[in-house]
């Protein structure tokens, strides 16, 4: 699976709004970075990433993701630290596949953030949106939330909690189940 890629970054964001403009920000970024060791065709090295970000705007939607201002201020990384982390993942790696559930939402926040930190910065990695796969599999436009896919594919031992790393683990389970159902997921990659 995914033979053209040396790394795969499955990620999710929790945000304080639905749009990055005028003052929407990433509150939390979670991800699972999978790497193929040299000479291998299987992803076997895993790095879990979970960071809260120190923000200047008020937190909204705390009732959904349960992230508080105190959590971000006390345990959060600076925007500069997040930028360096993401640059190391997205960087100049055309062999790193980016995977998300509803990737247009997450990517618009990440792109806006990277552009804010470094004007002109472009993310050029190939992207796989698993929501697009889910819509094709169900034949429905609505009713394809990640929690719906967890139930549909009977994925065990995962939680869709609206916390970024939990949702990445759920995505990993759903993605494996979808691959077993029909191994055509690579056809959905947008370069």
Regions inferred by a protein language model and the residue ranges of each:
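Acidic donor-binding loop at a coil-to-helix junction in glycosyltransferase catalytic cores
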Residues: 165-166
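Conserved non-catalytic scaffold segment of RNase H-like nuclease domains
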Residues: 2-124, 139-162
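A structural signal for well-ordered alpha-helical segments within the folded catalytic domains
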Residues: 144, 169-172
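Conserved beta-strand -> loop -> alpha-helix junction used to position metal-binding or nucleic-acid-contacting
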Residues: 121-135
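Acidic two-metal-ion nuclease catalytic site recognized across multiple nuclease folds
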Residues: 1-3, 152, 172-191
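Hydrophobic side chains within alpha-helical segments
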Residues: 109, 132, 169-170
């Amino acid at each position: 699976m995914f033979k053209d890629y040396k790394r795969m970054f499955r990620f999710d964001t929790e945000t304080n709004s639905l749009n990055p403009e005028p003052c929407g920000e990433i509150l939390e970024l979670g991800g699972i970075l999978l790497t193929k060791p040299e000479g291998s065709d299987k992803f076997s090295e895993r790095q879990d990433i979970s960071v809260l970000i120190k923000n200047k705007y008020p937190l909204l939607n705390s009732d959904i993701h349960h992230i508080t201002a105190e959590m971000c201020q006390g345990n959060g990384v600076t925007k500069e630290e997040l930028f360096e982390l993401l640059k190391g993942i997205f960087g100049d790696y055309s062999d790193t596949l980016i995977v998300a559930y509803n990737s247009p939402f997450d990517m618009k926040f990440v792109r806006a953030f990277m552009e804010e930190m470094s004007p002109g910065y472009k993310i050029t990695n190939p992207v796989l949106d698993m929501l697009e796969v889910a819509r094709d599999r169900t034949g429905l436009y609505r009713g394809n939330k990640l929690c719906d896919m967890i139930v549909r594919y009977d994925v065990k031992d995962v939680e869709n909690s609206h916390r970024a790393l939990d949702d990445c683990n759920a995505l990993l389970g759903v993605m494996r189940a979808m691959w077993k159902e029909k191994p055509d997921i690579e056809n959905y990659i947008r370069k």
